[in-house]
Amino acid sequence: MNNAIFPNKFKAALAAQQVQIGCWSALASPITTEVLGLAGFDWLVLDGEHAPNDVSTLIPQLMALKGSASAPVVRVPTNEPVIIKRMLDIGFYNFLIPFVETQEEAARAVASTRYPPEGIRGVSVSHRANMFGTVPDYFAQSNKNITIIVQIESQLGVDNVDAIAATEGVDGIFVGPSDLAAALGHLGNASHPDVQQTIQHIFARAKAHGKPCGILAPVEADARRYLEWGATFVAVGSDLGAFRASTQKLADTFKK
């Protein structure tokens, strides 16, 4: 196949447990995304859950990353087959599925990205992902080149981490530290020992099933600790956070 998307290098890197350093994109801006794509990150999350993103804003961001070595990962707003199908059709191959609590929910996410008989993805013969029908073996290659990362961020998800990690087709486990902290009774305090112990437990159980773990860690000390604990893919910051910090610093330099 003469298509740079296949094979999926990010999926292969996760399977090989190669450390992948990423960044979170929440500004919903093609220009910002293009700048991130030039920075040298291994992967970038384009957030469709908490950021103001939808199909119309994500397509220009995918275009902005064309030619970048950074793998685009979309966090969908919910584990819903129609939403996932639309993200597939516009050209995403790497998915972060929020708030997965059971093996059944994990399996549903996988099925949503696979064509029958392996899954339930609807079939369109011409869309952006298959270069509008010009990729002859897209149907044969697509199923095995999709990355599914499921996000554990509740007590029920923690309780079911073994079953979730063992789900066929799940490529990785991602910890949502803020929601996990809230679920454990420590809203706004992901550094609480209970939360940190739970994160370490999730990492250990995922590793026991041979699945790589990831997390968002905008504080350097946290990111380095999670890497020491065995995290494979870590988002070490965000465009929003970097922009706010740098502009605040600039203003403070001259205003104070």
Curated annotation (Swiss-Prot):
CC cofactor: Mg(2+)
Tell me the keywords, alphabetical order. Lyase, Magnesium, Metal-binding
GO biological process assignments? D-glucarate catabolic process; galactarate catabolic process
The record's listing under InterPro entries reads: Aldolase/citrate-lyase_domain, GarL, HpcH-HpaI_aldolase, Pyrv/PenolPyrv_kinase-like_dom, Pyrv_kinase-like_dom_sf
Pathway listed: Carbohydrate acid metabolism; galactarate degradation; D-glycerate from galactarate: step 2/3
Residues annotated as binding substrate:
151, 178-179
Active-site residue list: 50
Q: Where is this site: Increases basicity of active site His?
A: 89
Which reaction is this enzyme known to catalyze?
Answer: 5-dehydro-4-deoxy-D-glucarate = 2-hydroxy-3-oxopropanoate + pyruvate; 2-dehydro-3-deoxy-D-glucarate = 2-hydroxy-3-oxopropanoate + pyruvate
Q: Where does Mg(2+) bind?
A: 153, 179
DNA damage recorded as keyword = no
A Pfam short name: HpcH_HpaI
Q: Name one GO molecular function term.
A: magnesium ion binding
Q: According to its UniProt entry, what is the function of this protein?
A: Catalyzes the reversible retro-aldol cleavage of both 5-keto-4-deoxy-D-glucarate and 2-keto-3-deoxy-D-glucarate to pyruvate and tartronic semialdehyde.
Describe the subunit structure: Homohexamer; trimer of dimers.
This protein is called 5-keto-4-deoxy-D-glucarate aldolase
